[in-house]
Amino acid sequence: MDGTLLDLNYDNHVWNHALPAAYAQEHSINLEDARSALITHMQEIHGTIDFYSFNYWTAYTKLDIVELHRGYTELIEFRPGAKAFLNWAKRSNKTTIIATNAHPDSIKIKDEVSNISSLVDHVVSSHQYACPKENSSFWQNLKEDYDIDEKKSIFIDDNAPVLDSSKNFGIAYNLIVSRPDSQKPKKTDLPYPAFDHYADICEYLNDGISE
């Protein structure tokens, strides 16, 4: 969802700028020390469910992570062509599932702004399974709960390790977003077929969408 259907600029701004500033103020330290401490801890728990958990970060930082996110909701936007793509998928009777590492509170905030849940069939948070998408157990649980035929499924993400997990599980078609954050340049030399605007994958899907 984040960096795939929605602009990652929102999340990056909150976690990389707003959180360090609030953490520095709460703990009476300078901004660079706050940023360094947070980055170090993020690296330590990266790839775990705690990394994505609002509850975990609220306890760790002593800050209200939900309210922090609510302060920047004007940055929540669809990525180029994403909304049109979801509408096309619905018209084409294709089953769509948002499989996300986002915490349920994060999903709620973004859905209040974008109404993204109305555009798909299911929204599944990895927190339901207590393991992130990087873990093969996530995919096994998803398959069992939603009767996924991995040989006929396409998975889109902005995270290469997550795509590795999807591929290893057997998802046949894996695509990576080349510019998940609208405020940063496109990524190059990516390990999976890459695209920016959703119209770019029309040919890949052997069909078409329009904005």
Segment roles from a protein language model:
Residues 63-77, 82-114, 120-126:
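Substrate-recognition element of Asp-dependent hydrolases with the DxDx(T/V) motif
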Residues 7, 98-99, 157-158:
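Small/polar loops that bind or transfer phosphate-bearing groups
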Residues 29, 63, 94, 148, ...:
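Short glycine/serine/threonine/alanine-rich loop segments
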Residues 1-84, 103-105:
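N-terminal helical cap/lid subdomain that shapes the substrate entry/recognition surface
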Residues 24, 58, 72, 97, ...:
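Short, flexible active-site loop motifs that bind/organize anionic cofactors or intermediates
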Residues 29-31, 56-59, 90-93, 121, ...:
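Short, intrinsically disordered/low-complexity patches at protein termini
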Residues 87, 103-104, 108-211:
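Asp-based, Mg2+/Mn2+-dependent phosphohydrolase catalytic module
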